[in-house]
């Protein structure tokens, strides 16, 4: 009897542990996109993620006719490093639980992205010398 109870407890612990491993990791919330972009610039792996809150999230949900409880995920990744503190970043805004009708007639998760060049000081990196020469 004790053996069966011990096996049952062990099975419950293993099931609980397996569920914990498959659950999605918790993301922080932010209304500060600039801070998230700077976090990606500073990050060793060049990425940053958070749930977007505040007026920008509300506007995006209103424009896409998403339900009010829909969450907006912001993911920032590095596409290119120009020099220390200056990167080409891709910021993706997505609503994983909100499906929208596409022009092809399929229902797809809402997702859009922006690519931008940014330095830690807030200025764009100089990636080309075109137009910087003296006028003739």
Language model features: what each stretch is:
Residues 13-17:
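N-terminal signal peptide c-region/cleavage motif recognized by signal peptidases
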